[in-house]
């Protein structure tokens, strides 16, 4: 689930009426905006949209025309919401470049990925506030927005429930079995992961059991096509499938993932600042890792550089050496005190807590 989905679920659980607009997808429906009647969730109305014809071209070459076309979408969405929107939480400035068209009482622009372009700048200017999980984005756009909020990623309730139980029971196992298990979650066909480093790490550590969760094929993958899933990613995936000490779990539900990750002794985060859309400055998976309490061996992550929650390295060589050192000293790195520190941080950033922070922020606007 994406952050916006977790936020929608949490808001609905609080009794708010949420109108969740899906990303545009082609369908046989004659309308370009319509309610998805196939999904029934209390307090949530799912709204499907279809792509604007030649939308990318129009957005960049004829922004005025695109703005008029997308206005019809906003008008229909607002009508479905009863022609009254208290708060618009916009996560998609690539499509909705003029959020004021919705006529919401408050408009919040959430930039969780570092999108660039004049259309994003325009959306920032129209928003009442800008919210992001990384200062990389805020530093670039905050002059264009009015107030802004740096907000960490949220932790899903499935992870939080297990973390709270572990704190309650003082359940801080250093190592789950004789063979050390190291975990990684994420789309293996998305650019961003340092696959060269990951391959070297796996080859140099045959004594370690590596576990990967997430999409591991083009089918049912949220990568839009082979053009995004480069040959490098596909070659890396084939390498993983052929490695005897690698376990591929595929896609799991949030609840399943939260349970299965508890069996790990350590986690790795190895993104490339050159290929990751957010310059490897943050990731929601880190918060999920932290909720298990187990040590995280990572490349540089700017949003965590000052809190000592990750064991970070400056370059590939240092990462490999750090990995060896940490695994040889799990008693130290997975001590009860270290695990509790990580879990406490994760529990301070549940989606429930983030919504409370957003609500306090909105009251200042």
Q: Model-predicted segments: where are they?
A:
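Acidic anion/phosphate-binding donor-loop and adjacent secondary structure
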Residues: 118-122, 155-174, 178
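A charged, aromatic-enriched C-terminal amphipathic alpha-helix characteristic of glycosyltransferases
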Residues: 167, 332-364
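Nucleotide-activated donor-binding/catalytic signature segment of Leloir-type glycosyltransferases, i.e.
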Residues: 214, 223-258
